[in-house]
């Protein structure tokens, strides 16, 4: 039987292996071991018979928004409910933090629609876009579908940010 629990530092290598298996083909963004160690408290793992068979993280932007990210299960575990249990655990964590909206970006929207997520416009999630997406190599050609569950934030403050002007004019 699959169960979930909060990740701990000794889990990082197995989390890394699961994410790496999906980042090679572009399904997930790659995560370094150092990044995973720094953010291990964001992760939940799925275990079956004492072996980690899946992972997922909840990144908090504030009480108005959190993102489910890096969610994956081993190929042998697909279809056994591990993914659903991971999402449920992450949603409970968001609820514990009183987060009013949980978003995610995915290529499997049907899975998340069955869990109560709805389609979103990228413009509705500026915190995610300005903090993370702008650094992604696929930013201008992103094929992921934005989804949310809860109440889309009406105003987060990010839209009011001014782009800093360069201190010097660079010429080539």
Place the predicted regions along the sequence by residue.
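Hydrophobic pocket/interface hotspot
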Residues: 15-16, 112
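Conserved acetyl-CoA-binding loop-helix of GNAT-fold acetyltransferases
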Residues: 73, 79-94, 104
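Conserved active-site alpha-helix within GNAT-family acetyltransferase domains
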Residues: 100, 106-134, 138
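A conserved beta-strand-loop-helix scaffold within acyl/acetyltransferase catalytic domains
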Residues: 30-42, 47-48, 54-72
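Helix-loop element at the rim of GNAT/NAT acetyltransferase active sites that forms part
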Residues: 18-30
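C-terminal "cap" of GNAT-fold acetyltransferases
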Residues: 125-172
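A short beta-loop-alpha structural element at the N-terminal edge
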Residues: 2-15
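A generic "binding-loop/recognition-motif" signal
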Residues: 11, 64, 107-108
């Amino acid at each position: 039987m699959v169960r979930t629990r909060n990740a701990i530092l000794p889990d990082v290598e197995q989390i890394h292996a699961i994410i790496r298996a999906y980042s090679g083909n572009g399904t997930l963004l790659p995560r370094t071991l150092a990044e995973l160690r720094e953010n291990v408290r964001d992760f939940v793992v799925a275990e079956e018979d004492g072996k980690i068979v899946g992972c997922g993280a909840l990144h908090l932007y504030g009480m108005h928004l959190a993102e489910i990210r890096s969610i994956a299960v081993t190929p042998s575990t697909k279809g056994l409910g591990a993914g659903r249990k991971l999402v449920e655990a992450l949603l409970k964590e968001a609820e514990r933090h009183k987060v009013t909206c949980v978003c995610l970006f995915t290529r499997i929207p049907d899975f998340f629609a069955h869990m109560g997520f709805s389609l979103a416009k990228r413009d509705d999630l500026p915190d995610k876009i300005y903090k993370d997406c702008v650094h992604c190599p696929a930013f201008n050609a992103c094929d992921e579908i934005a989804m949310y569950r809860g109440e889309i934030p009406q105003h987060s403050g990010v839209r009011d940010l001014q782009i800093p002007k360069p201190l010097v004019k660079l010429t080539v």
